[in-house]
Amino acid sequence: MTQGLFIMCPGQGGQHAGMFDLARTDPGAAALLDKSGIILDEATLFDNALAQPSIVAAALAVWEALRAHVPAPMLAAGYSIGEIAAWSVAGALAPLDAIALGRVRAAAMDDAARQGPQQALAAISGVAIDTAAALAPRHGFEIAIVNGYDACIAGGLASGLAALGDALAAEGGKLQRLPVAVASHTSLMAPARAAFDVALNALPFATPACPVLGGVSALALRSKGQAVDELSRQLVQTICWSDCMDAAVEAGITVALELGPGSALARMMQARHPQIACRSVADFRSIDGIATWVARQE
């Protein structure tokens, strides 16, 4: 049986109108999606209010369908909003509570964004992290997520995008605006913390069956206090996803599975740690196909 299973829960970017289809082939997962009350609307899939809870729901519905057919994970982690889903995968949060928390998080972040000028999130590639971190503040941006040696996400005011893009191009880098209207994981999200923290503290947390890697700290966390602190801080602090991948490998994982939607996390893991067997559920046509692949790994 496969040992060292690492479950990865994605953030925004890979959502699509059919992202519940695979999970709906399982009665239990279909029931969870029905109870969530989420109706996917292609026109608003990238709006926070729908995107965040639906991404949590998609990941947890697939996990509901899959978990009886794969070994218990040794570790879980989530990218941005995916960190909420990861705590549910670990057994600490009930799935419907996690989805509801995703709704609160989205609303709080949208409220924070409305308090000032238009915000933006953008992918930076082709320059070292140190270079990106030096250039971003000159144009009103902060590093939101570190994905690799020369890949990160930056958040800030939309008015500074063009100038930041020019500065990066002069250094051989590239800037691509993302379909996210809030500057996630930057100080601009500070007004979102109060409402989110109230909802977060009110939720019942069970003892997780496996640790969850904190997105900010890349530490293996197990308690409600640690979860509350990390989930709150990640609204306004940099997500160190590259460190999370490294920490998972150092912990001894042998197989990594992204729950989807999308396959961005699987691609990043494959690029950074090619020795790890890694796939996304988005690569498969059936729950049985996923379970069979996991079982074949050693």
What kind of feature is each model-predicted range?
Residues M1-T131, V255-G289:
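FabD-like malonyl-/acyl-CoA
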Residues L135, A167, M268-R272, W293:
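Residue-level signal for well-ordered alpha-helical positions
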Residues V249-G252:
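Non-catalytic positions within long, well-ordered alpha-helices that form the structural scaffold/packing
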Residues A90-L235:
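Alpha/beta catalytic cores of group-transfer enzymes, especially the acyltransferase/condensing modules
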Residues T25-G28, V236, C240:
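Alpha-helical structural elements of signaling/regulatory helical domains
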Residues A59, A195, L200-L203, R222-I239, ...:
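Non-catalytic peripheral regions of patatin-like phospholipases
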Residues I239-A247:
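A short, well-structured juxtamembrane/interface segment
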